[in-house]
Amino acid sequence: MTTSPIRVRIRTRIQISFIFLLTHLSQSSSSDQSSLKTDSLSLLSFKTMIQDDPNNILSNWSPRKSPCQFSGVTCLGGRVTEINLSGSGLSGIVSFNAFTSLDSLSVLKLSENFFVLNSTSLLLLPLTLTHLELSSSGLIGTLPENFFSKYSNLISITLSYNNFTGKLPNDLFLSSKKLQTLDLSYNNITGPISGLTIPLSSCVSMTYLDFSGNSISGYISDSLINCTNLKSLNLSYNNFDGQIPKSFGELKLLQSLDLSHNRLTGWIPPEIGDTCRSLQNLRLSYNNFTGVIPESLSSCSWLQSLDLSNNNISGPFPNTILRSFGSLQILLLSNNLISGDFPTSISACKSLRIADFSSNRFSGVIPPDLCPGAASLEELRLPDNLVTGEIPPAISQCSELRTIDLSLNYLNGTIPPEIGNLQKLEQFIAWYNNIAGEIPPEIGKLQNLKDLILNNNQLTGEIPPEFFNCSNIEWVSFTSNRLTGEVPKDFGILSRLAVLQLGNNNFTGEIPPELGKCTTLVWLDLNTNHLTGEIPPRLGRQPGSKALSGLLSGNTMAFVRNVGNSCKGVGGLVEFSGIRPERLLQIPSLKSCDFTRMYSGPILSLFTRYQTIEYLDLSYNQLRGKIPDEIGEMIALQVLELSHNQLSGEIPFTIGQLKNLGVFDASDNRLQGQIPESFSNLSFLVQIDLSNNELTGPIPQRGQLSTLPATQYANNPGLCGVPLPECKNGNNQLPAGTEEGKRAKHGTRAASWANSIVLGVLISAASVCILIVWAIAVRARRRDADDAKMLHSLQAVNSATTWKIEKEKEPLSINVATFQRQLRKLKFSQLIEATNGFSAASMIGHGGFGEVFKATLKDGSSVAIKKLIRLSCQGDREFMAEMETLGKIKHRNLVPLLGYCKIGEERLLVYEFMQYGSLEEVLHGPRTGEKRRILGWEERKKIAKGAAKGLCFLHHNCIPHIIHRDMKSSNVLLDQDMEARVSDFGMARLISALDTHLSVSTLAGTPGYVPPEYYQSFRCTAKGDVYSIGVVMLEILSGKRPTDKEEFGDTNLVGWSKMKAREGKHMEVIDEDLLKEGSSESLNEKEGFEGGVIVKEMLRYLEIALRCVDDFPSKRPNMLQVVASLRELRGSENNSHSHSNSL
């Protein structure tokens, strides 16, 4: 059978097609393999840039494996399409050129790593990207101008928490048709957005836009309404001013609008409520809005969170609004001027969890039907209002309540027993009202209660025994009531009790020793009662406790310290959340006191492992007997107030061991004997009052005691010495017979020498040996005598400090570890000689970290020696490591560390001596009373620039970066060229590393220079340093100290300067000495005084300083920006160092 030609042709074609298909598949496979190999090489190239991979994420990135098997890599169709290494903790100096050839990559996620990555590298990414997430990845620089137009396929961009600077690129919204999510939050972007073109066609896909946490300024652009599908808009924490555009009401799909923490003004536009029916979250807090709350907000029926706090909104709160808010969960209206009756319609908010009406002018009564209407309510905050009436018993029907704060109102009646039904209640705060009656026993049912703060009321009766069932209680304050009976000993069973305030009541009986069992007690105030008996020694033997997690967490405290004798006790501790500081001036019982608000923050203690009481006030009672020696075991004690009792005996020597003690008042007692010499060691002591006792003998002349006013030692007939009249010299004669002893000794030596010669003639070999031994012994005796004499001089009367070196062998021979050749052979003995035994005459300063002495060396050069405060622990290894690090830091605007030395328990640092002393002394006059030097504008500007450059170097050029923590004018020293040198950098870190017991206030800065956020958290930051140098800059410009009650009243230099700026009175901030200079011909020759070039420069300088002291850290510039801004001022560098333009 023959095959037809047609079949042959068909078979041939099939064969040819099959061969072609095999060839194509082979070529395609070869191409895919090649592309995959290229992808692998790109990823491995990126891996070589990684210097640290703590979680070994990249351990399986190997040439032997397919890149599709690499951790964090996803492939599709044999190509790499997604890289996700977010949160891996990778670090290194990287570039995106490694990813350029990944032409199938669509998703790149590298957030939360520690790269050093220049923003220009963004332009090296593949054009195929649709999703880019690089938050917290170390990006620096400006956003590239053509980035958004080049990557027009991007759907989502997240670049938050980096260090972008400069303005937003002009093409941001021009080529973003596909872009749905853009997050540039928490960078350092500046400039306005009002000039950006936002066409409707390019912004139509945008649903999420976040520019928060930058320094963007100007008004909010109307053209944002072209983003018609926008669901979330966040412009918070910027510098926007002007009004909210009325056109925002056209954003009909908007669910979240956050404009908080800006400088917006005007009324809240009613249009927002007219059309935003989908709005769920509205945050307008921390602005300058005025007017009333628009009733049109009632249209936002889906609203879940409404935050209008910290504005100047006035008028009554519209009742109709709350009736429409069926979904509302959070309502924040604090710190406004809202008046009228407390809104009764709040009971209609069935889902409401948090209601904060603090610091307004609400009046009327708390609605009786508040509960169970608002059955979900967890926090009810009403402090600092004008609310009257009683606490409604029905409040117990809000069973979810955790916090009730009714402080600073005009409530009366009694505490309803029904409050015991609130089983979840943690805080019941109602201080300063007119609440009367007894404390209900039902309080004992509150097993979760942490804070019971009822001071300044009219409570009577005794503390009920049921109260001690509240086993989780942490803060109890019944101060300034009319409570009676004895202080219950059951306080000792409260294992979490930290603050106990029972002062100014009618308690009788003795102080229960059981209080010493409270392992976490740090604050005990029993002043102004009728307590008798002795101070129980058991208090001083309080067992230390490890830190308890969450102790007093969430509390905002203020310590109102009394000054003078107008009020009893040292002061009072109050819960200050939601209360304006100026309200303290309006409280009658406090207004009669001369007081200063000394501290506010979350907690006054670090609760160290060896924690004991920090504040003890037993004044104004009828206590007898001796002050127990065990008080000296309270190693954390900072305030000890024992005045106006009937205490007798001597002051215990052990009190001088309380190295953190800052206030000690034992006045108006019957104390006898001498002031212990150990008090010389109290380096933090700022107030002592021993007046009206029977003390005798000299006041210790070393340490702080002789520097305090004489009034604090008055009416002690036998007391003498500075600051009182000199003591009669009856027992200070030098020992007799010293010279005779020396002559006898020399005679003996001469006789021995003669005998040696005779013996040498007879037995020459033996005489040589004896002579050598004898010479060595004599030299050793002489050296020992000289050493003893020199060491004795350290403890002599003229020595300005105390020493602990007795355990050190041959201390005088110890070398000073130095970082400069010319000081290589320096020994401790030479430092003693150079300071005349560290005498008071050689002391040139003292501060929180120790005393400073001027030492003149034998070659005529001078150095400064800082003797650090004596630390409680021996951290030799940490000390030496820190010194070696600090010794390597060199910059022309830093005071260089030349060397260091450890002798016994003492640590000495050797610095270069600065001829003109500190900026504080130059600005405000030296303490010696000499005439102060008047600084001109060019000198002041030069000093400000130098100090900024020094701090900038610490922040940005040191590895690791150094946060100063205590930047102030006394830590800016001036060399022979009047060049500013920052000193004491690294000290706070050193001290805190070596001594965990040191008070927080010592390590967190100096009053007047401390940024507001430090009072909410003890975490020191670089932006905190920026605030502090901003204060120094204001100090330079104004010539005023940062704190001065006579000058600023209840505010400080920062608050006063901001007020003058708001009022348009900028010129009043400038120092009068500069204005005198400014009125001269050199300033106003051509343009007139206020229009003069230099005056304009001063005002620009003021603007920079005010930016540094912004209340919000995110709005402050970093030090690179500060230096750049100061550099833009009309330069004086041409007259000084030619290199002053660089760091």
Curated annotation (Swiss-Prot):
Q: Name one Pfam family in it.
A: LRR_1
Membrane topology per the entry is: Single-pass type I membrane protein
List residue spans for each LRR repeat.
Answer: 77-101, 102-125, 126-150, 151-175, 177-200, 203-227, 228-250, 251-275, 277-299, 300-324, 326-349, 351-373, 374-398, 399-422, 424-446, 447-470, 472-493, 494-518, 520-542, 570-594, 610-634, 635-660, 662-681, 682-707
Residue list for modification Phosphotyrosine:
Y911, Y1009
Extracellular-side segments: 32-756
Supply the domain comment.
Contains two pairs of conservatively spaced Cys (Cys pair 1 and 2) possibly involved in forming some heterodimers.
Q: What is this protein called?
A: Serine/threonine-protein kinase BRI1-like 2
What high-level taxonomic lineage is stated for the organism?
Eukaryota, Viridiplantae, Streptophyta, Embryophyta, Tracheophyta
- Tell me the gene name: BRL2
